[in-house]
Amino acid sequence: METVFDINEIMKILPHRYPFLLVDRIVEHVPGERIVGIKNVTINEPFFQGHFPGHPIMPGVLIVEAMAQVGGILAYMASDDEVRNKVCYFASIDNVKFRKPVLPGDQLRIEVAATGCKRGIWCFSAKAIVKGKVTTQAELKATFADKDRL
C-alpha cells in the first residue's frame, strides 16, 4: 500500500496531536473527490484502559472522529490558501451506523468521499473498514473557521 501522505505531512495539515490524532497515513487521494486514510489500532491506545477493561473496543465516537479527520484532509487539500490558514471543524454527523467492533490489532481503512460543498460547508460520505468489512458508516459535514472565532 503506497503512502500518499505520511504522519509528518498529516501533522502539517491537522492541528490534532497524540492522543487525539487518529489517522496514521493517507494511501489514496483524488483531490476534491475522495481520500483513504489508515489508522493502526494498537492495545497501547489510551482509551482501551477504560473502554472496556478485559474487552477492549475502540469507542465509536473516535471512529467517527477519525473519519472527520480524514475528511478534513480532503477538504484542506482542495481549498485555496486563504482556507489553509484556518481550522476545519466538524459541523454535523448524520446516519451513523456501527456495524462491527474495532479491536486492538485492527487496521482501520477510512474511506471518505466528498458529496458536495456549498457556502463553505463540505459534505462527506464516510466508511470505516476492517478486513474488507464495514465497521462504521456516516454522513459528515465540516467547515473552516478562524482558530479564535469559536
Curated annotation (Swiss-Prot):
Subcellular location: Cytoplasm
Gene3D superfamilies given in the database record: Hotdog Thioesterase
Major location (coarse): cytoplasm
EC number(s) reported in the record: 4.2.1.59
Annotated Pfam families: FabA
InterPro entries listed in its UniProt record: FabA_FabZ, FabZ, HotDog_dom_sf
GO biological process, one term: lipid A biosynthetic process
Catalytic center residues: 51
GO-annotated molecular function: (3R)-hydroxyacyl-[acyl-carrier-protein] dehydratase activity
Transmembrane segments: none
Membership in a protein family: Belongs to the thioester dehydratase family. FabZ subfamily.
Annotated protein name in UniProt: 3-hydroxyacyl-[acyl-carrier-protein] dehydratase FabZ
